[in-house]
Amino acid sequence: MEELEMKVFEAFAKDWALVTAGSMDRFNTMTIGWGAMGTLWGKSAVTVYVKPVRYTHEYLDANEYFTVCFFPKDYKKDLSLLGSRSGRDGDKVAETALTPVAVEGSVGFAQASLTLLCKKIYRQDMDTAAMPEDVVKRNYEVEAPHTMYIGEVVKVL
């Protein structure tokens, strides 16, 4: 596995990323601001969090692979759009300057400065009973909690 040099605490929260699952003929992507990178079971891993109401959730559940793509700051407007519209309502990617590309069993984007191809190795719905009360009030009083997806990083592009 290649070494990555990045500010991991800013990569998700400040710079954002796209998580994408599916194939070139049928995929969905969404902007994520929560995530983690590290190791699990001796493997390089990425964790992403997606609410069950999001269209991308269906694709993550149905597919073995997903990508996490990071972009130069010039694409922040595109990531904002992809995080505010649903793929259920049409081709939101067509409204951006991003070009989808096939990535060995999933989909990435030509403009990404970093693409992590991940094989899904764990999926778990988060349990509000195990969370601090203030976190539940702030994030989960209206909608169900996120699903956590952990992917083994099988390729860095």
Predicted segment positions?
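Basic, polyanion-binding surface patches
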Residues: 1-157
